[in-house]
């Protein structure tokens, strides 16, 4: 199946909720993709096609998934391409020694962490999450990978809220599978 066909079928699965979680917000619900095994497989297939088209035979060592929705598909994608999966979590959720970085949220700051031995110097990394909005959390994850001397090749998202220009904050190119709100 072509990437374009996969995108069309996956886009049809999305639901929108007006005024959620607050008035004036249109919430893009990706969960129906994960509730249907065929759609979930199509999501992984679409990302695999993109990675193959973009990087050819270049080895991707690590998929980094952001807390929490990057955990929905990050491990499955990592397994599908023969890469390791490494979680980036909110502060205090990972055991052992960690490296941390702050990022700005709508109403204050938050902190992400990664285990300090999770990525080896020189490893190639793709960072994944469900949606890129302001780009703060994704940029923070990229900073953590860089602190561990990994090479961020790309950021991959299911959706993007283009009007927030989050990709401008990222340290590597961004790929969005489905078009989101303009």
From Swiss-Prot:
Subcellular compartments: Cytoplasm; Nucleus
Catalysed reactions, as listed in the record: AMP + diphosphate = 5-phospho-alpha-D-ribose 1-diphosphate + adenine
Origin superkingdom: Eukaryota
Cellular component, GO, one term: cytoplasm
GO molecular function: adenine binding; adenine phosphoribosyltransferase activity; AMP binding; metal ion binding
SUPFAM superfamilies: PRTase-like
Listed Pfam families: Pribosyltran (PF00156)
Pathway in which this enzyme or protein is active: Purine metabolism; AMP biosynthesis via salvage pathway; AMP from adenine: step 1/1
Keywords: Cytoplasm, Glycosyltransferase, Magnesium, Metal-binding, Nucleus, Purine salvage, Transferase
Cofactor: Mg(2+)
CDD domains: PRTases_typeI
Residue sites binding AMP per the record: 133-137
InterPro entries according to UniProt: Ade_phspho_trans, PRibTrfase_dom, PRTase-like, UPRTase/APRTase
EC category: transferase
Protein family (similarity comment): Belongs to the purine/pyrimidine phosphoribosyltransferase family.
NCBIfam families (UniProt xref): apt (TIGR01090), PRK02304.1-3 (NF002634), PRK02304.1-5 (NF002636)
Biological function: Catalyzes a salvage reaction resulting in the formation of AMP, that is energically less costly than de novo synthesis.
HAMAP family for this protein: Aden_phosphoribosyltr
Protein name: Adenine phosphoribosyltransferase
Gene: APT1
């Amino acid at each position: 199946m072509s990437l374009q066909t996969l995108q069309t079928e996956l886009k049809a699965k999305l639901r929108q909720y007006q005024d959620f979680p607050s008035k004036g917000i249109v919430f893009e619900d990706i969960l129906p993709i994960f509730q249907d095994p065929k759609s979930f497989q199509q999501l992984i297939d679409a990302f695999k096609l993109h990675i193959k088209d973009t990087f050819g035979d270049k080895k991707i060592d690590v998929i980094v998934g952001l807390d929490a929705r990057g955990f929905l598909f990050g491990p499955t994608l990592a397994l599908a391409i023969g890469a390791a999966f490494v979680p980036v979590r909110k502060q205090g959720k990972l055991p052992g020694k960690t490296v941390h970085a702050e990022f700005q949220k709508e109403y204050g700051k938050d902190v992400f962490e990664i285990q300090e031995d999770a990525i080896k110097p020189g490893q190639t990394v793709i960072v994944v999450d469900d949606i890129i909005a302001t780009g703060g959390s994704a940029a923070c994850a990229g900073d953590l990978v860089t602190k561990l001397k990994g090479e961020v090749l790309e950021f991959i998202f299911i959706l993007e809220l283009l009007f927030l220009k989050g990709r401008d904050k990222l340290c590597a190119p961004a790929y969005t599978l489905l078009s989101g709100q303009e």
